Amino acid sequence: MKKINVAAAIITKNNKYFIAKRNKNKHLGGFYEFPGGKQDKNETLQETVIREIKEELEVNIFVGKKLGEEYYKDEKINVHLHYFFCTIISGNIVLKEHEDSAWVSKEEFKNYNFAEGDKDIISLL
């Protein structure tokens, strides 16, 4: 199975982090995640996260420093996840692909079930 690069946004505002609940009809449905998506050919990871957040949340973001990377593999996917700190620069969040969302503090992460990979990166925040 080919490894896929995925870029995810750690969107921050007022010491809170934006998380979104995956669509129940998709792989890992019902779990929370830091939104993002697959890297297209000839696209940088920063371009990937900007495009994916615009498509999924209808907002424009500034991509800051990279937080870290994680790997996740199961019977359906093999991904190399790249996480970037981001801030919203324009627009209001509209959920196009996710079922729910929340702005949470570090202490509140434990109240949500995260997708594999994403739950491992939380310790770096």
List the model feature ranges, each with a label.
Residues E56-V63:
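Short secondary-structure junctions
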Residues K16-E55:
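Conserved Nudix-box catalytic region and its N-terminal flanking loop in Nudix hydrolases
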Residues F85, V94-L124:
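NUDIX/MutT-family hydrolases
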Residues N60, E69-N92, D100-A102:
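Active-site-adjacent beta-strand/loop module that shapes the phosphate/pyrophosphate-binding cleft
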